[in-house]
Curated annotation (Swiss-Prot):
One of its GO terms (biological process) is trans-translation. Keywords: Cytoplasm, RNA-binding. InterPro entries: SmpB (IPR023620), SsrA-bd_prot (IPR000037), SsrA-bd_prot_CS (IPR020081). It comes from Escherichia coli O6:K15:H31 (strain 536 / UPEC). One of its GO terms (molecular function) is RNA binding. It is found in: Cytoplasm. CDD domains: SmpB (cd09294). One of its GO terms (cellular component) is cytosol. This is SsrA-binding protein. Belongs to the SmpB family. SUPFAM superfamilies: Small protein B (SmpB). It comes from the Bacteria. Required for rescue of stalled ribosomes mediated by trans-translation. Binds to transfer-messenger RNA (tmRNA), required for stable association of tmRNA with ribosomes. tmRNA and SmpB together mimic tRNA shape, replacing the anticodon stem-loop with SmpB. tmRNA is encoded by the ssrA gene; the 2 termini fold to resemble tRNA(Ala) and it encodes a 'tag peptide', a short internal open reading frame. During trans-translation Ala-aminoacylated tmRNA acts like a tRNA, entering the A-site of stalled ribosomes, displacing the stalled mRNA.
Length: 160
């Protein structure tokens, strides 16, 4: 009998929304499943996804992911009409949906997609309840990040 090769998993992350953390204060995060079609799963396995402009819309007691772009592969979708930016239903339990509805109905809160990743064989999306940042908040975050880099450089050079 032949031995199976040890599986060296790469990163389980498919796509990140770095812009969301720059433009919003993320207050709470949820993990949601996605209702996908077959060609979308194959494209996600190939890493052809972009969620930088995506957001979550709550409607009729359900949550939907808008603006996520999953590029179809030519070989995977020959007989199906593919819509790369179609609305995809998020799979959340009722308690999580109620929490999201309560938060979003407050002034200034929105729900954004933070990352798209694999969990076992299932595709999951991490969504966050967020409040928009002002321009001065973004600048202070950049200053803080630069200070952390400078501090690390100073500490590294001080030991020589």
């Amino acid at each position: 009998m032949t031995k199976k090769k040890a599986h060296k998993p790469g990163s389980a992350t498919i796509a990140l929304n770095k812009r969301a953390r720059h433009e919003y204060f993320i207050e709470e995060e949820f993990e949601a499943g996605l209702a996908l079609q077959g060609w979308e799963v194959k494209s996600l396995r190939a890493g052809k996804a972009n969620i930088s402009d995506s957001y979550v819309l709550l409607r009729d007691g359900e949550a939907f992911l808008f603006g996520a772009n999953i590029t179809p592969m030519a070989v995977a979708s020959t007989h199906v009409v593919c819509d790369p930016t179609r609305t995809r239903k998020l799979l959340l339990n009722q308690r999580e949906l109620d929490s999201l509805y309560g938060r979003v109905n407050r002034e200034g809160y929105t729900v954004v997609a933070l990352s798209l990743y694999w969990k076992n064989a299932w595709c999951k999306v991490k969504i966050g309840v967020a409040k928009g940042k002002k321009q001065h908040d973004k600048r202070s975050d950049i200053k803080e990040r630069e200070w952390q880099v400078d501090k690390a450089r100073i500490m590294k050079n001080s030991h020589r």
